[in-house]
């Protein structure tokens, strides 16, 4: 299994937006990590604090399944920045090309009926995110037209 490695900036506080947790279990875990000052997505912590293994590690991103997948998703992957940043503006341009290549690869492997990409960049208190570390959700949708996957793009949703 691949393991990501890139040096990171010092994590900012807060690391987690607890009100964005989708379950009590997720909220409790985020509280524990926040108290310990651990960002679950920083490369040096992902192997010990994220349940799902890293399936691919690139120069700018690594890929893992979401520990808390969206209800109704056939598959839910996270493409996580190797750097502790919150915005795409903080990454070099070549990170975008690598992200697109990862998305194409996952789409060809999953062969979903449809694929939703959720990109929350910037302040998690406004974009509905739960972790202050840039990551992209790739959600493969069920083959049944009645299947619904909902995700939050605002804390007011």
Question: What name fits each language-model region?
Answer:
Residues 2-157:
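HIT superfamily nucleotide-processing domains
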């Amino acid at each position: 299994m691949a393991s990501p490695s890139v040096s990171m900036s010092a994590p900012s506080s807060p690391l987690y937006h607890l009100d964005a947790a989708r379950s009590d279990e997720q909220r409790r875990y985020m509280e524990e990590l926040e108290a310990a000052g651990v960002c679950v997505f920083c490369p040096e912590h992902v192997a010990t604090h994220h349940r799902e293994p890293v399936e691919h590690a690139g120069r700018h991103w690594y890929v893992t399944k979401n520990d808390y997948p969206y209800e109704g998703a056939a598959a839910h992957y996270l493409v996580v920045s190797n750097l502790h940043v919150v915005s795409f503006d903080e990454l070099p341009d070549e990170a975008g090309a690598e992200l697109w290549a990862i998305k194409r690869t996952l789409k060809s492997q999953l062969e979903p009926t449809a694929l939703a990409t959720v990109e929350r960049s910037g302040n998690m208190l406004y974009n509905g995110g739960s972790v202050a570390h840039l990551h992209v959700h790739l959600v493969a949708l069920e083959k049944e037209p009645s299947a619904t996957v909902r995700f939050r793009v605002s804390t007011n949703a």
